[in-house]
Amino acid sequence: MFSRSILILTFCLLLGGSVTAQDPPLPTASPTPFATDKNGIPPEKVGPVPPVNPFYRSNERDIPELSRVGVDMAEQKPLTLDGAIIMALENNRDIEVSRKNVRIAEFDLLAARGVYEPRFTGQLYYERSTVPNVSIFSSNQTTTQSTLVGNTALSAYVPNFGTQVQATFNNQRLTTDNPISILSPQLNASLGFSVTQPLLRGRSMDPQRRTIEIAKRNLSLSDAQFRQKAIEVVTAVERAYWDLVYALRNLGVQKDGVRDAKEQLEHNRRLVDEGQLAPIDIVAAETQVANYEGAVYDALNLVNVAENALKNIVSPHRRDDIWEQAITPVDEVRVEVPTVSLDQAMVTAFANRPELDLNKVQKDINEVDRRYYNSQRKPQIDLIASYNSAGIGGTPNPNFDPNFPTPCTVNPSSPECQQQLANLQLLTGSPYSGVFTNKYPTYRVGIQFNLPMFGDKTARAQYGRALVEGEKINTQREALEQAIQVDVRNALQVVKTAESRLRFASIARENSDKQYESERRKLDNGQSDIYRVLERQTALTAARSNELRAQTELNKAIADLERAMGNSLKANGVDSKVK
């Protein structure tokens, strides 16, 4: 049995050797040559390089002053977020422009309504004329006539139905040397009333009412634009405020890093003195201190940029005292995260977003235009009615001398002469007795029309344009609603992501702190080296900064969520009324 086992083992070894002998030999690895150009010249030998300032050396120099440009650090200005928002709304130039636009819209509406104020017009003049005599009944070569005219009128539009009313009161005093004029001076007076009522075009909507309705909508438009700008400014203030909070706290973290690095440097020196570390390990610690000191200046620059951004929003002008002050945010970094579902956020956004209000106002203006241009397509047919009462008076002409016989020149005692004198008596005296006793009335009722021969192409085109404009506004609203939906969904997701980042950043900071302390203990016990300690120290500083960044980013995400829901003003207790 043992012999058979040996034979089988020998056979297997021989078979394996034959199979191995049949396999092709593996290629041997050859080193990859360094790159050369087509002439075989390696990069380090390419061409002569001209010397440029070959003797430059970076010499030691004084460290720049640790301060912010143009800021007196002794002039501290504590500032809350609410205080910054109030300053921005009061001083921001864009807000002031929006506020002025609202006032302008108010005056535009007031001016548009002025069309319904009654208009009192009149004229008063004296005229003297001399003309040649062309009448066979007068022997004078010329006739001189003096006229004194005083006319007044009161006209107005009725707010409804496009009605126009007018009242006139005319007066005239005429003096002449014409011998055939019965009266000199002659007094003429009249009192008239007229009404023009559109029956088709202009009855439901006329230019005056269109102007007023559009002015009303423009006022709402300006108010919505003001709220939109206020929301933008409030959000910008919140973001700038939290950026400054992070920058200042990050500056503190970097200063703590310098302190820890210097403590580690002193600790390493003691270990070198004790013989546990080589002297060269002190160099690494000194480099760490220098790196952290440079990080302090970088953090200070970040503070300066963030502070200037906030000052630019809240300051009224470039010469304000705040530019020389150091802003100190005093609000708590932790902000309560709003608990709102997607459906609730969408309902709030659709109710509060000023963009939708702007679109609605534009739609209302378009509806006014549609009504107006639809009215303009109709034929212009107006009902007109007028009443006029006239009167005449004066004094008999003392120079009356007709060149033809009259009943009084033929027979002064005849009935005809008596009737003529009676008629003359009716003409003398005050003209107003005839005016107010309706002695000489005139009545008129009729219609007037203005019909285009081949249809009003202009009105039809304007009405068609208004219809298309309405369709465009509806399409824009659909796009706005979809964009708002995306904005709200993204804002909610960013808040959730920021919450998770804050949690993970806090865990990372705690663990980095533990790892750093553990690595220091290992170094003291000879179980680690200085480089791992410095690595843990750098990681701890970065974790502290990341935790602060995560907290402020969460605050900014909450501000963006309030903006997306159109709730920034209410959330910060801001009244959007224009003062």
Where are each of the predicted segments found?
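Acidic, low-complexity, intrinsically disordered peripheral segments
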Residues: 4-9, 20-48, 128-130, 308, ...
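Bacterial Sec-pathway N-terminal export signals of envelope proteins
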Residues: 22-147, 195-210, 214-216, 241, ...
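Small/polar, glycine/serine/threonine/aspartate-rich low-complexity segments that form flexible
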Residues: 69-76, 124-193, 328-338, 371, ...
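Sec/SRP-type N-terminal targeting helices
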Residues: 97-100, 113, 160-188, 201-224, ...
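Periplasmic alpha-helical coiled-coil/stalk elements that build and connect Gram-negative outer-membrane
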Residues: 112, 224-344, 494, 498, ...
